[in-house]
């Protein structure tokens, strides 16, 4: 009972809303000294009046040096559009394949820019609710049943992995001299369009067909 009251008291003391520069500095200093994880300890260690979840999201989506805060490039736009055709509104899966971008960044950019740029049948089927949902990518699905609903997430994971495999094969086929030049460009310009590592998935149109990433078993769950 005492533990519950203490937790309720702590929850009431947590701040919400915009972070201040001072709060950001406290969080960055903590991560610098203690690393990521154990976010709930930050309150006790630093006195920062933010819950562990808020600290984690603030770090992952804004403060982490791995987050690219620059404008989206044409290559990134192309990649996001391709992945959305495969995966629908599964922003976490998409963001893992767009180096330096978070799922929130990708989701917000899709809703505010990319979905409005697309025209025709595909754009009319796009949902812009801003949340992950169970909608199916319009490229493949016209009707879905509930019999395989529980298998859909595994199917999307498998599709994403096949996409990774296609890109990895494309990477291996590139001449070593070209790869070395791209590594230098990436190091000097920080432009992800020059990078062909396993975490960057820009491939030419000729390298794959989206429909080839669906197996017969996958299709069974959607038709």
Curated annotation (Swiss-Prot):
Alphabetical list of InterPro entries matching this protein: Homeodomain-like_sf, Myb_dom, Myb_TF_plants, SANT/Myb
Protein's UniProt keywords contain Nucleus: yes
Primary site of residence: nucleus
Role noted for this protein: Regulates the production of a signal that induces hair (trichome) precursor cells on leaf primordia to differentiate.
Record-linked PANTHER family: TRANSCRIPTION FACTOR MYB8-RELATED-RELATED (PTHR47999), TRANSCRIPTION FACTOR WER-LIKE (PTHR47999:SF59)
GO cellular component: nucleus
Matching Pfam families: Myb_DNA-binding
Top-level taxonomic group: Eukaryota
Localization terms from the record: Nucleus
Domain (HTH myb-type): residue spans on this chain: 11-63, 64-118
Protein name from the UniProt record: Trichome differentiation protein GL1
DNA-binding region: 39-63, 91-114
Keywords: DNA-binding, Nucleus, Repeat, Transcription, Transcription regulation
GO molecular function: DNA binding
Gene3D superfamilies in the record: Homeodomain-like
SMART domains: SANT
